[in-house]
Regions:
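Cofactor-binding active-site loop characterized by glycine-rich and histidine/acidic residues
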Residues: 1-89
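Conserved thiamine diphosphate
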Residues: 60-63, 102, 110-161
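Generic beta-sheet signal
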Residues: 63-67, 94, 171-179
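Active-site metal-binding loops of divalent metal-dependent hydrolases
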Residues: 70-73, 100, 179
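Active-site glycine- and acidic-residue-rich loops that bind
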Residues: 72-78, 151-159, 225-227
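Short internal beta-strands
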Residues: 93-100, 104
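Glycine/aspartate-rich loop-and-adjacent alpha/beta segment that forms the canonical ThDP
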Residues: 155-213
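Conserved N-terminal beta1-alpha1 strand-loop-helix module at the mouth
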Residues: 214-235
């Protein structure tokens, strides 16, 4: 959707998501305008990003590379190979975001391959709130990364974390962004069944109504000036 807003393709094309013949598939497709690299199979994206960042340093380019990885994706060994490589070569012009929503294709991450600790039952809420149970950051620190942990629903925290990451020298940074998948949507919130599918047409108006009633774009974001964002964001 962000790429549609940026003008890479018409917003109406979003309705073709994951349909046969569509340029918008579950993983980025090279046929899609604006896509230079296909991030599937899972786990390859961080390696690719490390390569771009390292090449920029070798070529003395003032580039900073940002990448997003999933917590379910972190089941893949290649993620951790890339983590070791970035640390070894001190790729400090790389910032990774880990979308820590505790959900992957089949179920909750802590039931399949825990990053924090084993989950008993289906209630992830208490683990999301209890920082004493978070072990993911320790894993990344052990690989030599600078670790920042934030509430991924707070734009001002995201902005502050990016600023800190850009100022960090000698090591790559990972921003562990704790989120609730499908937040505030009755049909989707914290439900693994919605991991990778588009809603049916009869549900779309309900979803749009729920979103319109709860969210607005802060003036600071529109203006590109974050200095007063914390005062504008009330939730």
């Amino acid at each position: 959707s962000n790429m549609a807003v940026a003008g890479y393709f018409p917003e109406s094309e979003i309705e073709t998501l994951r349909k046969f013949g569509s340029r918008l598939q579950g993983h980025p497709d090279l046929k899609c305008p604006g896509v230079e690299f296909c991030g599937g199979s899972l786990g390859t994206g961080l390696s690719y990003s490390v390569g771009i960042a390292l090449a920029a340093k070798i070529d003395s380019k003032d580039h900073h590379v940002y990448t997003i990885i999933g917590d379910g994706e972190s089941d893949e060994g290649q993620v951790w190979e890339a983590a070791m490589t970035a640390s070894k070569y001190k790729v400090d012009n790389l910032t990774a975001f880990l979308d820590r929503n505790f959900i992957q294709q089949d179920s909750y991450t802590e039931k399949i391959m825990p990053l924090d600790e084993n989950l008993e039952g289906d209630d992830i809420a208490e683990m999301w709130k209890d920082a004493s149970r978070w072990k993911t950051g320790d894993k990344w620190r052990s690989f030599g990364w600078n670790v920042l942990e934030i509430d991924g629903h707070r734009v001002e925290q995201i902005d502050a974390a990016i600023t800190k990451a850009n100022a960090t020298k000698g090591v790559p940074t990972i921003i562990i962004s704790r989120t609730i998948k499908g937040k505030s949507l009755e049909h989707m919130e914290d439900n693994p069944q919605w991991h990778g599918k588009a809603p049916d047409s009869d549900i779309v108006p309900i979803i749009n109504s729920e979103l319109d009633s709860q969210f607005l774009i802060a003036p600071s974001i529109i203006a590109g000036d974050m200095s007063n964002l914390e005062n504008e964001v009330k939730r």
